[in-house]
Regions:
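Beta-lactam-recognizing serine transpeptidase/beta-lactamase-like catalytic domain environment
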Residues: 2-8, 80, 226-236, 276-328, ...
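Periplasmic/cell-envelope proteins involved in peptidoglycan metabolism and beta-lactam response
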Residues: 1-300, 322, 342-345, 350, ...
């Protein structure tokens, strides 16, 4: 039986083919559209990102921070060096969701939410594209291991070996050398981005800040081929960095330690100078702090403890402490009186225990209420007689007195390389009119003559004023840097020397200061007992709170922090000075009883050998004989 013949439905087949063609065409168009959209997104929307990423996938220039210059004391003892350390760095452009990566870091290293906040703050600071940002320093071996195990979860994160500033002497030189710290937003805006590329710390205070350009060095560069994740494939070219310059300071660590020991646990300042050169031999401000805390970022808790301490360990008393100079200024006032011709060395003033201006009934008291009788210049300095200097200040007048004391550095910055120094205050008629809108009164001139009133000075200024007496008016600006890479620092703004009409006036004041230490009635004679050299000195007391006329100072009724400050300045050997020392003991009350022994101990540490004998280079043929005779 034959099969039936099927007739093909061409219309149906055509519809089927057309449907398939249309579907295929739509699919192709859709795919092409998706590809075009994706291409547009990559090439247009994300052009800048992928262009940079592509470039960095081929050649990446990464900075090589220069090793920072080292800092030594005058004998070659290291004060500031660099030690290797491992830090955790993160490149935001290679980390994708970098905030999520921070969360992983905190989890992996078991850190606190406070650490997370600090990390984010560091990541948001201004920086160059594709520059790694250190977020955690001083990694332990365990932390490094944890990062390595979880590296796949931490894109853009790497452990980096680097040199970190270190202060092996701890708190000894915190107020002179200063410290380094992280570059903040304000500093970042003012720094040359090329010179500080890859650098995250900068000198904040002291020598570290003043000589930042010399210590920093010059950044090097490395051209490397990397993949998109930042992994270095090969080094194409390298330009080595130029290390920073080494600095040798004039400070002596043994003298520094001796000064700290002499001051004990008391709040105060000690500064020692070489009057012939201006070199700072010791510089102590107590209490102090460990500068290593600041290098990689101090914790909020640690900083709060330092900042809020009632003893103010962060405060540099040598450079910024402002105190009335008290009677330590009297040698300079004496020079002013002699040079102005208002007194001679033999001029005598009668002291009944007080001084009164003509036509005034106010009594300006001498510290010795019973009076010293007739006193000349020598006796006035030896006894620190206030009445004599009231009279001398009155004869000079405020205009001449202010001008002369300004020549000694009072009221201006005196150092060559101490960034934080305060100028202090040397009051004048014009100053009071401008700041207080008041006229100058005669009584204010009197108390200025004994270092009280508006006058404010730093321990460094008092040391320099005393150095001018020791050096017979020759100015040598105090400085900390002895050499910078072997070169001595240059004073581009030298101070004019003090030229007297009669140079022998220096010797007259010098002799009076020697009598303070060695005279039978000298105010600080006890501090010179057993000295193998002649000392010229002057005690002082700086009032913290005023005492009404007729009242007597009663320490039992005064709070400890309201008691007078103790001051003393001196130089030795008196006939050929090798060291000048200025001491301030906060609330120490007695310059001769508290501050003078500190000066003596510092001088002994510098002038005597290990056996307690005067070093040969400091010996004077008649110094021991003269000392014994006065005692």
């Amino acid at each position: 039986m034959s099969q039936p013949i099927r007739i093909k439905d061409h219309e149906k087949d055509a519809r089927l083919v057309r449907g398939r063609v249309v579907f295929g065409a739509i699919a192709v168009v859709t795919l092409i559209g998706v590809l075009i959209a994706r291409l547009y997104f990559l090439q247009v929307i994300q052009y800048e990102y992928h262009s940079t990423l592509s470039e960095n996938n081929r050649v990446h220039v990464q900075p090589i921070p220069p090793p920072r210059g080292l800092i030594y004391d005058r004998n070659g003892v290291v004060i500031a060096d660099n030690r290797p350390s491992f830090s955790l760095s993160m490149t935001r452009e290679r980390s994708g969701d970098w905030q999520q990566v921070l969360d992983v870091i905190v989890q992996v290293l078991e850190l606190t939410p406070e650490d997370r906040v600090i990390f984010e703050k560091r990541m948001r600071q201004g920086r160059r594209p594709f520059e790694p940002v250190p977020i955690l320093f001083e990694l332990s071996e365990e932390q490094i291991a944890r990062i390595a195990v979880n590296q796949f979860r931490l894109p853009g994160v790497e452990v980096v070996a680097q040199l970190v500033r270190h202060y092996p002497q701890g708190a000894h030189f915190a107020h002179s050398v200063g410290y380094m710290g992280r570059i903040n937003e304000k500093e970042l805006k003012s720094l040359d981005p090329v010179s500080y590329s890859g650098t995250h710390q900068i000198g904040k205070t002291g020598i570290e800040r003043f000589y930042e350009p010399e210590l920093h060095g010059q950044v090097g560069y490395e051209e490397v081929e990397t993949n998109a994740r930042g992994r270095v494939l090969r080094v194409l070219k390298r330009t080595d960095p130029i290390p920073g310059k080494d600095i040798v300071l004039s400070l002596d660590i043994k003298l520094q330690e001796a000064a700290e020991a002499a001051l004990g646990g008391r709040r105060g300042a000690v500064v020692a100078l070489d009057p012939k050169t201006g070199e700072v031999l010791a510089m102590v401000s107590q209490p102090s702090f460990d500068p290593n805390l600041f290098v990689t970022g101090i914790s909020f808790k640690a900083y709060s403890e330092l900042r809020d301490s009632i003893d103010r360990p962060l405060f540099n008393r040598v450079l910024r402490g402002l105190y009335p100079p008290g009677s330590t200024i009297k040698p300079a006032v004496a020079i002013a009186g002699l040079d102005a011709g208002v007194v001679t060395a033999s001029t005598r003033v009668f002291d009944p225990g007080y001084y009164m201006l003509p036509n005034y009934d106010h009594k300006y008291r001498n510290w010795n209420r019973t009076g010293d009788g007739y006193v000349d210049l020598d006796t006035a300095i030896m006894r620190s007689n206030d009445t004599y200097f009231y009279d001398l200040a009155h004869k000079l007048g405020i205009d001449r007195l202010s001008a002369y004391l300004g020549k000694f550095g009072i009221g201006q910055k005196v150092s060559l390389d101490m960034f934080e120094e305060s100028p202090g205050l040397m009051p004048s008629r014009e100053w009071k009119r401008a700041t207080r809108r008041q006229a100058w009164f005669p009584g204010e001139t009197l108390i200025l003559g004994i270092g009280q009133g508006y006058m404010q000075s730093t321990p460094l200024q008092l040391a320099q004023a005393t150095a001018l007496v020791a050096n017979k008016g020759i100015w040598n600006r105090p400085h900390l840097a002895k050499t910078i890479e072997g070169e001595k620092p240059v004073d581009h703004n030298p101070m004019p020397d003090i030229i007297l009409r009669d140079p022998s006036d220096w010797n007259k004041v010098n002799h009076g200061m020697q009598q303070v230490m060695h005279g039978a009635r000298g105010t600080a004679r006890k501090a010179s007992i057993g000295a193998q050299y002649r000392i010229a000195g002057k005690s002082g007391t700086a009032q913290v709170v005023a005492i009404k006329q007729g009242e007597k100072y009663d320490r039992s009724k005064v709070q400890e922090r309201h008691r007078d400050h103790a001051l003393f300045v001196g130089f030795a050997p008196a006939d050929d000075p090798k060291i000048v020392v200025s001491v301030m003991v906060e609330n120490g009350e007695s310059g001769s009883g508290v501050a003078a022994p500190v000066v003596r101990q510092v001088m002994d540490a510098w002038l005597l050998d290990q056996d307690g004998r005067l070093k040969a280079e400091y010996a004077s043929p008649n110094s021991a004989e003269a000392t014994a005779r006065d005692e």
